[in-house]
Amino acid sequence: MSRLRPILSLILVFVAIFVVSCGSPKASVPTTYSPEKIEQLQVLVEPITEAREKMSVLQELIADQNWIDIQTYIHGPLGGLRQQMRNLSTSLLPKDQKAAADLGKELFNRFERLDAAAKERSISAAQSQYRQAVQDFDAYLDLIPQAS
């Protein structure tokens, strides 16, 4: 039995090498969006697009210098936007994910600065952050492929 152990070990090594070498190659990452993927992305982008359309409410609150409602709007209706944008960003192709994630982070940095401007009751800072937030929002939405 002691003479068979080295032979058995050698056979197991050969079997392991054979099994590993017969493994399938890695799946390639798609470089374009399929129609099914675009449909899926359109479902994910819908609430984000609705939030973008409602940004005019925030602009009106800033114009009225309604500081408490500005903060409430940022933390209320726009509160779930971060998670929705993160989910959408991770659903994009790898080449677009980083840009989408960076724009999403920048947008929420703008919201945080807008919130701080509302606390300080600074209309000029609030207007500036609002304009930049809208630009970031539009740039983010421009990354999302549209159905043809």
Stretches with model-predicted labels:
Residues 65-69, 95, 114-128:
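Short helix-adjacent coil turns
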Residues 18-21:
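C-terminal motif of bacterial Sec signal peptides marking the signal peptidase cleavage site
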Residues 136-148:
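Short, low-complexity, Pro/Ser/Thr/Gly-rich segments in the mature regions of secreted, periplasmic
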Residues 1-11:
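Bacterial N-terminal signal peptides that target proteins for export
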Residues 81-101, 148:
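Short, solvent-exposed, charged loop/turn and helix-capping segments
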Residues 23-72:
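Immediate post-signal-peptide N-terminus of mature secreted/exported proteins
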Residues 43-53, 57, 73-80, 87, ...:
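Charged, amphipathic alpha-helical oligomerization/scaffolding segments
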